[in-house]
UniProtKB/Swiss-Prot annotation:
UniProt cross-references to NCBIfam families, sorted A to Z: PRK00033.1-5
Organism for this UniProt entry: Legionella pneumophila (strain Corby)
Subunit structure: Binds to the N-terminal domain of the chaperone ClpA.
Gene3D superfamilies: 3.30.1390.10
Annotated signal peptide: none
UniProt protein name: ATP-dependent Clp protease adapter protein ClpS
BP GO annotations: protein catabolic process; proteolysis
Length: 111
């Protein structure tokens, strides 16, 4: 390999590094969404805690705090996720509540 070829490879490598730096700074983080549980007058509190523990992996203490927030304030934040994950969690929670004959509703909103 000649010195000229080596210099070309080095220059190309530097140019590629500069290009990848420019590209990576243009990429934005995905928007986050809050997944909410909405209060109703019929869903038992223990079912809400079960949902929070099962679908959002909250421990008992935190699940109870969120459940009380839902109960007293009308809604509570279960977690913050990217759009796809938030949509999936909302769908799973709503389906699980329907399967168990509870009117509990979950929704999502941008953070």
């Amino acid at each position: 390999m000649s010195r000229q070829n080596l210099e070309e490879i080095i220059q190309t490598g530097i140019a590629d590094t500069e290009l990848s730096t420019e590209i990576s700074t243009a990429i934005k983080r995905p928007r986050k969404y809050k997944v909410l549980l909405l209060n109703d007058d019929y869903t038992p509190m223990d079912f809400v805690v079960e949902v929070l523990k099962h679908f959002f992996h909250l421990n008992e203490e935190v699940a109870i705090q969120v459940m009380l927030q839902v109960h007293f304030q009308g809604k509570g934040v279960c977690g913050v996720f990217t759009r796809d994950i938030a949509e999936t969690k909302v769908a799973l929670v709503n389906e699980y509540a329907r399967m168990n004959q509870h009117p509990l509703l979950s929704s999502m909103e941008p953070e």
